[in-house]
Regions:
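Active-site rim helix/loop that mediates acceptor-substrate recognition in acyltransferases
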Residues: 24-61, 74
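Feature marks short, surface-exposed loop/turn motifs that line or immediately flank catalytic pockets
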Residues: 30, 79, 93, 126-130
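Conserved beta-strand in the GNAT
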Residues: 61, 67-77, 83-90
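Conserved acetyl-CoA binding element of GNAT-fold acetyltransferases
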Residues: 82-93, 121-125
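Conserved acetyl-CoA-binding loop-helix of GNAT-fold acetyltransferases
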Residues: 91, 97-110
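Conserved GNAT acetyl-CoA-binding A-motif
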Residues: 112-152
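C-terminal "cap" of GNAT-fold acetyltransferases
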Residues: 141-189
Length: 189
């Protein structure tokens, strides 16, 4: 099920400082190349991880046999728990492509279902000209542009599509002029 990687997926607990520190560093490292403003500093990332640990949220971590963090996923309930926002998902850059992200998402979907959730949504920013939606006028022929989206630089939207997520909209200029957020959703009920 997990490819070549031997791992366990656990609920990250607020007292697990060792993994919390690794998670903060992972957020900085995993987003640095294409989303440098996401968590520019370790302190910002540490604050995000602590927010992920709030009681009503989901926070799951993939850990290898030696106790090292391989990836992390978080979720925020919305619409009275009918919808959950997947935020964030990060996998160690040198471990990507080995099924860790897929396993975290499948686990997250099960967590959402067990809480009565119906739909998962996510936003996947395009801050680095990674898709044909970058620098496009998304106020004109919006759905045609979404329907004809092209992946120019390995943007993760195709990863999510393979797991059953569909593009349900965009937020034009979410990260500055010509830098949209691509909204995706999946029914999990």
């Amino acid at each position: 099920h997990f490819g070549f990687v031997n791992m366990n997926i656990i609920t990250l607990q607020p007292d697990n400082e060792h993994i919390i520190q690794q998670a903060a560093q992972l957020l900085v490292d995993a987003f640095r190349e294409h989303w440098p403003d996401a968590w520019a500093t370790f302190d910002e990332a540490t604050k995000e991880v602590h927010e992920m640990l709030e009681r009503e949220r989901i926070c799951r971590a993939a850990i290898d046999d030696a106790g090292n963090l391989l990836g992390i996923i978080g979720g925020i309930p919305q619409y009275d728990g009918h919808v959950w926002e997947l935020h964030p998902l990060a996998v160690q850059p040198n471990m990507q492509g080995q099924g860790i992200g897929r396993a975290l998402i499948e686990d997250f979907e099960a967590q959402v279902r067990s809480r009565g959730g119906l739909t998962i949504t996510l936003g996947s920013d395009d801050e680095d000209n990674m898709t044909s939606l970058s620098n496009a006028d998304l106020f004109e022929n919006t759905w045609e542009k979404i329907q004809n989206i092209r992946n120019l630089k390995g943007h993760p939207f195709e990863f999510y599509q393979k797991l059953g997520y569909v593009i349900t909209g965009v937020v034009p200029d979410a990260n500055g002029i010509g830098k949209p957020d691509i909204m995706m959703s999946k029914r999990v009920k």
